[in-house]
Amino acid sequence: MSTNGTLSKPEFPANAASKEYAASLDAADPLAGFREKFIIPSKANIASTKLAKPGLSSEPCIYFCGNSLGIQPKATQKYLEAQLDTWSSIGVCGHFTKIEDSPLKEWQNLAEQAAESMSKIVGAAPDEVAAMGTLTMNLHLLLASFYKPTATKRKILMDWKAFPSDHYAIESHVAWHHLDPQETMVLIGPDEGTYEIPTEKILSYIDTHADEAALILLPGIQYYTGQLFDIPKITEYAHSRGLIVGWDLAHAYANVQLKLHDWDVDFAAWCTYKYGNAGPGAMAGLFVHEKHGQVDYSEGEDAPKFRHRLTGWYGGDKSVRFKMDNKFKPIPGAGGYQISNPSAIDLACLCAALSVFDETSMAELRKKSVLMTAYLEYLLLKDTTDESRQFQIVTPSDPAARGAQLSLLLKPGLLHKVAHRLQEAGIICDKREPGVVRVAPVPLYNTFTEIWMFVQQLKAALEE
């Protein structure tokens, strides 16, 4: 079983390489209307060095960088203005007063509004999700709770090319416990000359290190290659060998279907500014499975028993939050991991972005995404051979083993020239040293015609 089950790879007719065919896919797209819910940066604006209002020109850019930062939903301004008006008009009363004509709950309950919407995206119960902090900060909090090394079980299994912030976080927790990172951090990578890490290799690492490993922490989707890991299979197997299992879902959140509760994942964390469109540095989210979030009062109301974590007043139950008696009683579930009063301004941006997802489902978005990425792959490979191409797609070809992103490894010396040429053509995508262009058509706002146009520009840039 794969993360998304068995996915059939879309097949395309003989005329699929034409612009007319791309336009026909757009015309038949049931989600096409969602594009109107976003502000697409214009070609003129992305070339400007001064602040400009949206729509400086009528010609939008082609924005394939949602795997780095999503574009702004039109709802964001409305939600922010509502929050600012609440603050300016009633001040501190905004914590408890529900404004009838605002799309937002009172500040005291606003994080729960966001968590409820996020829970549908990650496949969890609302009380298993908390809207809080940022990704690395949340990983620190979760590691403090779940990484409990012993004299015999202290290793952490992780991705060989983890995003640097994840690596730093794990390394710091290892050092915090006075352990040697070189001996404690076990890096799982692909075989020499390849980029995909087979599931069986991960399982073999679990077998090899199970007696000494305390935890495995992997990315749901590897940020560099775009590989989607088999979350349920890896989680189940690691549990069978006695490991705690955590996932960094930075590139999986709002990109692929997730069922964190059903898959019995112990903990997970994600950012919301990529496919989630909540804005640069937006408030993040975390998941704690219900089995770890329970609060036991069997020994009395003043002696709650719960999983150890770093605590703060906002993780305290609302019934005691303002009593100021220094008797911590955590909110059951992920909410009990909250530390401080969250920014109502940040939550407004997050709730605005989530309001778009509330109008559809991850199943529908994933269905379109699989077709878009397959079409991109088809056009990139058409009329080429391994020998003639000046790039290699290092993302798995199996739709069940990838999300929206394709990572193109260019031949040496081409990256900066190609990236410059694409930007001149009004195309925004992500480059990663030493030679990868990451292309991510996002089903909420990108089109099949844009995919066709991108491929024409890329091939022209490679031929220069």
Swiss-Prot record:
Entry superkingdom: Eukaryota
Modified positions (N6-(pyridoxal phosphate)lysine) are: K274
Q: What InterPro entries would the database entry show?
A: Aminotrans_V_dom (IPR000192), Kynureninase (IPR010111), PyrdxlP-dep_Trfase (IPR015424), PyrdxlP-dep_Trfase_major (IPR015421), PyrdxlP-dep_Trfase_small (IPR015422)
- Compartment(s) where it occurs, according to its Swiss-Prot or TrEMBL record: Cytoplasm
Q: In which pathway does it act?
A: Amino-acid degradation; L-kynurenine degradation; L-alanine and anthranilate from L-kynurenine: step 1/1; Cofactor biosynthesis; NAD(+) biosynthesis; quinolinate from L-kynurenine: step 2/3
Please list the residues that bind pyridoxal 5'-phosphate: L135, T136, F163, P164, S165, D166, D248, H251, Y273, W313, N341
Per the entry, which co-factors are needed?
pyridoxal 5'-phosphate
Q: Which molecular-function annotations from GO does this UniProt entry contain?
A: kynureninase activity; pyridoxal phosphate binding
Q: Which GO terms describe its biological process?
A: 'de novo' NAD biosynthetic process from L-tryptophan; anthranilate metabolic process; L-kynurenine catabolic process; L-tryptophan catabolic process to kynurenine; quinolinate biosynthetic process
Keywords assigned by UniProt, alphabetized: Cytoplasm, Hydrolase, Pyridine nucleotide biosynthesis, Pyridoxal phosphate
Under Pfam families, the record lists:
Aminotran_5 (PF00266), KYNU_C (PF22580)
- Known EC number: 3.7.1.3
One Gene Ontology cellular component term attached to this UniProt record is: cytoplasm
Q: Could you say which residues form the signal peptide?
A: none
Catalysis: reaction(s): L-kynurenine + H2O = anthranilate + L-alanine + H(+); 3-hydroxy-L-kynurenine + H2O = 3-hydroxyanthranilate + L-alanine + H(+)
Which enzyme type, at the first EC level?
hydrolase
| Similarity comment: family membership | Belongs to the kynureninase family.
Role, per record: Catalyzes the cleavage of L-kynurenine (L-Kyn) and L-3-hydroxykynurenine (L-3OHKyn) into anthranilic acid (AA) and 3-hydroxyanthranilic acid (3-OHAA), respectively.
**HAMAP family, per the entry:** Kynureninase (MF_01970)
- Quaternary structure, from the entry: Homodimer.
Tell me what this protein is called. Answer: Kynureninase 2
Identify the species of origin: Neosartorya fischeri (strain ATCC 1020 / DSM 3700 / CBS 544.65 / FGSC A1164 / JCM 1740 / NRRL 181 / WB 181) (Aspergillus fischerianus)
Name of the encoding gene: bna5-2
